[in-house]
């Protein structure tokens, strides 16, 4: 079947994007790699002055039989060295990125070897439905999001965001004068019917939204994941009202099976054979990218949560038309993701291969399932057993939430003036005093408003007295996690006057 080309969405580009002209120097940088050219065109330091001749690494060996967190031993270790230069391709069978190239200016889209691995990975994970898609390396999803705002948004423009969303993403938008208008969510993520209602009732004269920013899987902060059938409905709404979908997916591969409360049933499920690659791929949530027939989706992926945050390396997948202004922006801002990072990640992935990388991702699923189960077990054990305290076991990501009906607090009306956020702040400080940090949900709340404003019904909250706290099971040992949640439970028992 012949796939269509993507649509042209350049009419959504920002004034900055439309004003930016390509750097003339970047048009000739490719000639630096031509051995027939004496390159006198740019201030590129001589590679002889790079004070590193090689980079040697020990990394675990697929299929990681002892688990991905096990110490690396001689039997389960890959040792390799990446050199500054190679005489020819035969001297570089692993397709490493030479240090002389990785540490030089150029290749703002990313090093070709790494991009080729990512393209192959993308074909395995996503069912792409238009032909002119490509990938562009980034310095992680924070950089990718900041670039997206600059490519598409002017001051005063409006974007749609989940009612509670990653605070740094909201702050990035607000710092650029972009209005973040909240869309209602529930335990299954964005509610399509309410999104449609927001758009149907959009105030005439208010700027129309250009983007919908969403964290579909293991959402930060709520831990929710958008159900597949909802994604289809959301995509159709985006088509109808002509906005782009920015799919921020750092937690996509931290998907898990649903939480099983009964320990015997859980042990039975865990005793079943380990998933093979095909089963793993089939179990993954459908993506907005796989639904996209027009180039309307901009997907942001990152190695931060699957390899290490300090790599500061990720990629954007989108149409070549949309990626072009990103490249022009990066040529004048980040130049390129760090060369050492690209060398290290590419060398590891090329030796693992696509199958080995899937083995790693399967290992992550196993580890995070254990961590999630530990957290939810402790919450059910130590939190008050009351309808006022709701736990939503996540099926992906690093976060859980405890939803609390503030109105049941005995001093809600007197001490806290019926203000749920006064109680939230008080509880936050009480929990910290007990030596535990969980984060108030209000820190992630989007409260942007357009001018003229949107109708009141578009901003209604189902129960304004519900507050929540976000915790993570990613950062500490099971023992510390359990103790921390016990202290959280003790605080709630005491503050709400509930006897154990």
Curated annotation (Swiss-Prot):
Main location: cytoplasm
Cofactor: pyridoxal 5'-phosphate
GO molecular function terms noted in the UniProt entry: 2-aminoadipate transaminase activity; aromatic-amino-acid transaminase activity; pyridoxal phosphate binding
EC assignment: 2.6.1.39, 2.6.1.57
Reaction catalysis annotation: an aromatic L-alpha-amino acid + 2-oxoglutarate = an aromatic oxo-acid + L-glutamate; an aromatic L-alpha-amino acid + 4-methylsulfanyl-2-oxobutanoate = an aromatic oxo-acid + L-methionine; L-2-aminoadipate + 2-oxoglutarate = 2-oxoadipate + L-glutamate
The keyword Cytoplasm appears for this protein: yes
InterPro entries, per the entry: Aminotransferase_I/II_large, Class-I_PLP-dep_aminotransf, PyrdxlP-dep_Trfase, PyrdxlP-dep_Trfase_major
Gene3D superfamilies attached to this UniProt entry: Type I PLP-dependent aspartate aminotransferase-like (Major domain)
Subcellular localization: Cytoplasm
Entry GO terms, CC: cytoplasm
Sorted UniProt keywords: Aminotransferase, Cytoplasm, Phosphoprotein, Pyridoxal phosphate, Transferase
Residue positions, PTM Phosphoserine: 100
Pathway the protein acts in: Amino-acid biosynthesis; L-phenylalanine biosynthesis; L-phenylalanine from phenylpyruvate (ArAT route): step 1/1; Amino-acid biosynthesis; L-tyrosine biosynthesis; L-tyrosine from (4-hydroxyphenyl)pyruvate: step 1/1; Amino-acid biosynthesis; L-methionine biosynthesis via salvage pathway; L-methionine from S-methyl-5-thio-alpha-D-ribose 1-phosphate: step 6/6; Amino-acid biosynthesis; L-lysine biosynthesis via AAA pathway; L-alpha-aminoadipate from 2-oxoglutarate: step 5/5
Single GO biological process annotation from the record: tyrosine biosynthetic process
Function statement: General aromatic amino acid transaminase involved in several otherwise unrelated metabolic pathways. Responsible for phenylalanine and tyrosine biosynthesis. Active with glutamate, phenylalanine, tyrosine and tryptophan as amino donors and with phenylpyruvate, hydroxyphenylpyruvate, 2-oxoglutarate and pyruvate as amino acceptors. Also active with methionine, alpha-aminoadipate and leucine as amino donors when phenylpyruvate is the amino acceptor and in the reverse reactions with the corresponding oxo acids and phenylalanine as amino donor.
Family: Belongs to the class-I pyridoxal-phosphate-dependent aminotransferase family.
Additional remarks: Present with 1770 molecules/cell in log phase SD medium.
Name this protein carries in UniProt: Aromatic/aminoadipate aminotransferase 1
Organism: Saccharomyces cerevisiae (strain ATCC 204508 / S288c) (Baker's yeast)
